């Protein structure tokens, strides 16, 4: 085993580049990894410990060293190819330029793989989730925007080939959405969606505005991981279950049967309701699914607060009141304020496909680097 190999790869790349290439697509001026590389001794100690002895890396260690070796070889290839840029043969110089571009792309991918191998996955990453959207400041315009965001996530679920089931849906008078929730399940659904929680702000001329003025409205997204039976056990004695007649849309059975269900978790006071379906049994099942997600989220928050001290990871530990993203329609731009990243072409972004997925990946990348900083601060 050669634990120093990983360190040498990181040190060599840092000396030549100064920043992590996998982060080039992020608009970040103070990446945690820059700070990390500035303390080279800490990184070296950490890598030698992890690759050399840490039990958590016993499974990953062969893969980590293999990827590090590939990266070291690719770095050497890049260095040798760069010398050809000064060759007298123009065709050879052009060939070298193409090879350098290809090498740099592969180096970025390999470096990214190493970061992923160093940062342990979270317990909830493979979980399904509950999505909740709620209109905020801005009246009917906020409700219209809430409806668009809910649709965007439904389309994103289809794009990722996840299962999407609406649990609640309370529309407004003009086609907007006051509040809605959905169950989303699929491959690493929570891992992709966990950074979407927070306040989303829209700036545009509302459909209801007659004088053409730009308004600012908000809506809130909550992302709650769904627990497994092992993760969370609820004592039936801790629950109070009430039934009532449903109100609002629902066809001929509205207000004729006690189909709506309200569940109260007595120890915490957390409430979960559902009247989406005509069947009381189905509504109870959906309400319990939401309640379990809320209780599990509370449990995770308590564990997280114990785990992290004064230095907080910037993404994923802030409250739901935090403004995370602005959708500026006049400028055709969406900006995520946590990583200072902007994307243009809002219409395409709101379709919930490639552009949203790009932003989700950027958030995951940045969170991984922050996690690595936190881990090293504790270990070294």
UniProtKB/Swiss-Prot annotation:
PROSITE patterns: RF_PROK_I (PS00745)
Source taxon at top rank: Eukaryota
Keyword Transit peptide: yes
Any one GO MF annotation of this record: translation release factor activity
Hydrolase found in the keyword field: no
Transit peptide residues according to the UniProt entry: 1-25
Modified residues (N5-methylglutamine): 252
Post-translational modifications reported in the UniProt record: Methylation of glutamine in the GGQ triplet by HEMK1 is conserved from bacteria to mammals.
Pfam families, sorted: PCRF, RF-1
Alphabetical list of InterPro entries matching this protein: PCRF, Pep_chain_release_fac_I, Pep_chain_release_fac_I_sf, Prokaryotic/Mito_RF
Ranges for region GGQ domain: 236-300
Location of this chain's protein in the cell: Mitochondrion
Segments forming a coiled coil: 63-118
Motif (GGQ): 250-252
Record Gene3D superfamilies: 3.30.160.20, 3.30.70.1660, 6.10.140.1950
GO BP of this protein: mitochondrial translational termination
Keywords from the named record: Coiled coil, Methylation, Mitochondrion, Protein biosynthesis, Transit peptide
Any one GO CC term of the record: mitochondrion
Known function: Mitochondrial peptide chain release factor that directs the termination of translation in response to the peptide chain termination codons UAA and UAG.
Family that this chain belongs to: Belongs to the prokaryotic/mitochondrial release factor family.
PANTHER family: LD18447P, PEPTIDE CHAIN RELEASE FACTOR 1-LIKE, MITOCHONDRIAL
Domain observations: The GGQ domain interacts with the peptidyltransferase center (PTC) of the large ribosomal subunit to trigger nascent chain hydrolysis.
Protein name: Peptide chain release factor 1-like, mitochondrial
Origin species: Bos taurus (Bovine)
Gene that encodes the chain: MTRF1L
């Amino acid at each position: 085993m050669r634990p120093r190999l990983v360190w040498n790869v990181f040190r060599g790349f840092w000396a030549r580049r100064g920043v992590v290439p996998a982060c080039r697509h992020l608009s970040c001026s103070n990446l945690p990894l820059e700070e990390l590389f500035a303390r080279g001794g800490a990184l070296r100690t950490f890598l030698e410990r992890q690759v050399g002895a840490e039990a958590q890396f016993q499974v990953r260690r062969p893969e980590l060293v293999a990827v590090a070796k590939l990266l070291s070889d690719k770095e050497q290839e890049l260095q040798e190819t760069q010398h050809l840029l000064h060759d007298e043969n123009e065709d050879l110089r052009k060939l070298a330029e193409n090879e350098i571009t290809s090498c740099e792309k592969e180096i970025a991918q390999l470096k990214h793989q190493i970061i992923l191998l160093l940062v342990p996955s979270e317990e909830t990453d493979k979980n399904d989730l509950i999505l909740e959207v709620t209109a905020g400041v801005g009246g009917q315009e906020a409700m219209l925007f809430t409806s668009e965001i809910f649709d965007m996530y439904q389309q994103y679920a289809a794009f990722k080939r996840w299962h999407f089931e609406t649990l609640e849906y309370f529309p407004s008078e003009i086609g907007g959405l006051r509040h809605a929730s959905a169950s989303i399940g699929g491959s690493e659904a929570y891992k992709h969606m966990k950074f979407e929680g927070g306040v989303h702000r829209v700036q545009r001329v509302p459909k209801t505005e007659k004088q053409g003025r730009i308004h600012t409205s908000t809506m809130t997204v909550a992302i709650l991981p769904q627990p497994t039976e092992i993760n969370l056990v609820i004592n039936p004695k801790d629950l109070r279950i009430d039934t009532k007649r449903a109100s609002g849309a629902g066809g001929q059975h509205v207000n004729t049967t006690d189909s709506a269900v309200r569940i109260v978790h007595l120890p915490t006071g957390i409430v979960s309701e559902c009247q989406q379906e005509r069947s009381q049994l189905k509504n109870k099942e959906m309400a319990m699914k939401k309640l379990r997600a809320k209780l599990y989220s509370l449990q995770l928050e308590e564990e997280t607060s114990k785990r992290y001290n004064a230095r907080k990871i910037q993404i994923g530990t802030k409250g739901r009141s935090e403004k995370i993203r602005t959708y500026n329609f006049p400028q055709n731009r969406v900006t995520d304020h946590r990583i200072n990243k902007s994307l243009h072409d809002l219409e395409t972004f709101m379709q919930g496909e490639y552009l949203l997925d790009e932003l989700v990946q950027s958030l995951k990348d940045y969170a991984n680097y922050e996690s690595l900083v936190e881990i090293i601060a504790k270990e070294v």
